[in-house]
UniProtKB/Swiss-Prot annotation:
Stored PANTHER family: HYDROXYACYL-THIOESTER DEHYDRATASE TYPE 2, MITOCHONDRIAL, HYDROXYACYL-THIOESTER DEHYDRATASE TYPE 2, MITOCHONDRIAL-RELATED
Protein name: UPF0336 protein MAP_3996c
Superkingdom of the organism of origin: Bacteria
HAMAP family (UniProt xref): UPF0336 (MF_00799)
Source taxonomy: Bacteria, Bacillati, Actinomycetota, Actinomycetes, Mycobacteriales
Residue ranges constituting the MaoC-like domain according to the UniProt record: 11-131
GO BP: fatty acid biosynthetic process
Family: Belongs to the UPF0336 family.
GO MF terms, alphabetically ordered: (3R)-hydroxyacyl-[acyl-carrier-protein] dehydratase activity
């Protein structure tokens, strides 16, 4: 396994998402329904308070909503030499520093920790440090993406089209 030539100098790169993600009570409720998490603390502030939370608490996987948007931006900002139309989410680890609550503003600082290539396949490890408006940590996420290698001859327009298609939820459209 080697570092792809196109990735030299990218490892350690930092990207701060240009805007925060504001956590809304209704988004928490909608997400909890979508993932079939029926814990009452995701639907009722009094239940959250009874469980010891200062506001409505989000399900643990709620970060996926904002995280997906940031993750797609990463592939274009870092120019990772991977064919975005042929990539899978291989692994993800979370370290929760505190629960995500209604009215939180989530800020994403994302780092490209490693990129390796072997036999035409690229593994990229991306770490996101999610903080609140005061800069205090909420969640650390480390995701490993696996995909077909894309080299200099790869078309930037094709990458942009793949990102747009994935964003629109058309996974098989490419």
């Amino acid at each position: 396994m080697t570092v792809p030539k196109e990735a030299e100098g990218l490892i350690g790169s930092h990207y701060r998402a240009p805007d925060y993600f504001e956590v809304g009570r209704e988004k928490i409720r909608e997400f909890a329904l979508a993932v079939k998490d029926d814990h009452p603390a995701h639907f009722d502030e009094s239940e959250s308070a009874a469980a010891g939370y200062p506001d409505m608490v989000a399900p643990l996987t709620f970060l996926a909503i904002a995280g997906r948007r940031v993750q797609l931006e990463i592939f274009t900002k870092f120019s990772i030499p991977i064919n975005i139309a042929r990539v899978i989410h291989r692994d993800q680890k979370f370290k929760f520093h505190r629960p995500i609550l209604a009215h939180d503003r989530l800020y994403f600082d994302t780092y490209l920790d490693s990129v390796i290539e072997s036999h035409g396949t690229v593994l990229a490890e991306i770490r996101s440090e999610v903080t609140d408006a005061d800069g205090k940590p909420i969640v650390t996420s480390v995701v490993t993406m696996l995909g077909e290698a894309a080299h200099q001859e790869a078309d930037a327009a094709a990458t942009a089209a793949a990102v747009a298609s994935i964003s629109a939820g058309k996974l098989g459209a490419i």
